[in-house]
């Protein structure tokens, strides 16, 4: 059974659309969802990632949620392998896999079977030492000078991925994205739906989403995760919302001042997501406010199938 992917910027309603599609198909065939949001891989990172609670998943099985502790480092290559196995297993039992998420490299690695360049421990160690010496913001700026596209797609707080991109550039002499596949037929002939809103409307949605996260207890969630090693987590500690709350707590605040930088950071991330996904000509884009998105999604999927 061929998969369906629902991708796009943060806060556009991808999870809700996926569940609506799953319910519509449920009378005909089984449906299971495969997460493609890097931060939803983490156990306990629920409020700040807008992870759907189990009770709100409408009985639809979900995969690649809550598979890492916050002390573990998320890896695109590992995700690619494990999520691909999930998709092929779901399809083999005659159900439809729906891939849902907006983590750019995770989506592309999965749908295009991205082959990752080899690593060199000595080169990696040298860039990691450089990160310690100059800090993540400066190193992100250095990446921007040698590979602007990679810098645009990587959060300026994500030291691990900045180091990896610089390592690949040094080892291959090519931009980090040169290791990415040429966009052609998507893996498994996946139908790809993109969900987005007009910018001012999405900004309002992001503001409301940010307010809701703080009202629902994001600061308390971060405090609880600190007891489980969040601060030592290479990737988890840099997640949007979590990094900002940590910074405010470290500055002696109570976490509430993290609301505005979280909103600003999320809006900036949305711009990067749009730039990345809009380059993919295979995506069928839908307006998030349209009332017939389920029907349009199913038409696109059936046209592929």
From Swiss-Prot:
Its cofactor is Mg(2+). It catalyses: adenosine(37) in tRNA + dimethylallyl diphosphate = N(6)-dimethylallyladenosine(37) in tRNA + diphosphate. Transmembrane segments: none annotated. The record marks 103, 124 as: Interaction with substrate tRNA. Its EC number is 2.5.1.75. Substrate binds at residues 10-15. GO terms for molecular function: ATP binding; tRNA dimethylallyltransferase activity. InterPro entries: Dimethylallyltransferase (IPR039657), IPT (IPR018022), P-loop_NTPase (IPR027417). Catalyzes the transfer of a dimethylallyl group onto the adenine at position 37 in tRNAs that read codons beginning with uridine, leading to the formation of N6-(dimethylallyl)adenosine (i(6)A). PANTHER family: TRNA DIMETHYLALLYLTRANSFERASE. Belongs to the IPP transferase family. Monomer. This is tRNA dimethylallyltransferase. The gene is miaA.
């Amino acid at each position: 059974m061929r998969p369906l992917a629902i991708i796009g910027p943060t806060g556009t309603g991808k999870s809700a659309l996926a569940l609506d599609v799953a319910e519509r198909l449920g009378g005909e065939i089984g449906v299971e969802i495969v997460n493609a949001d890097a931060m939803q891989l983490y156990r306990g990172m629920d409020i700040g990632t807008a992870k759907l609670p189990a009770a709100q998943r409408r009985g639809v099985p979900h995969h690649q949620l809550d598979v890492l502790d916050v002390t573990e480092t998320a890896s695109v290559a590992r995700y690619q392998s494990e999520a691909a196995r999930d998709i092929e297993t779901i399809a083999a039992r005659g159900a439809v896999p729906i891939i849902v998420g907006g983590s750019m490299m995770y989506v592309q690695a999965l749908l295009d079977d991205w082959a990752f360049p080899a690593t060199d421990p000595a080169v990696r160690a040298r860039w990691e030492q450089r990160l310690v010496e100059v800090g993540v913001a400066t190193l992100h700026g250095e990446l921007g000078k040698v590979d602007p596209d990679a810098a645009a797609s990587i959060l300026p707080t994500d030291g691990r991925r900045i180091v990896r991109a610089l390592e690949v550039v040094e080892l291959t002499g090519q931009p980090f994205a040169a290791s990415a596949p040429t966009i052609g037929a998507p893996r498994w002939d996946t139908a790809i739906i993109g969900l987005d809103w007009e910018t001012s409307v999405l900004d309002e949605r992001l503001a409301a989403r940010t307010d809701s996260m703080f009202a629902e207890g994001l600061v308390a969630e971060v405090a609880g995760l600190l007891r489980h090693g969040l601060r030592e987590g290479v990737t988890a500690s840099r997640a949007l919302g979590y990094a900002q709350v940590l910074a405010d707590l470290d500055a002696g605040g109570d976490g509430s001042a993290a609301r505005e930088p979280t909103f600003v950071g999320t809006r900036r991330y949305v711009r990067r997501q749009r730039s990345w996904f809009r380059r993919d000509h295979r995506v069928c884009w839908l307006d998030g406010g349209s009332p017939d998105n389920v029907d349009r999604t199913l038409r696109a999927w059936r046209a592929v199938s």
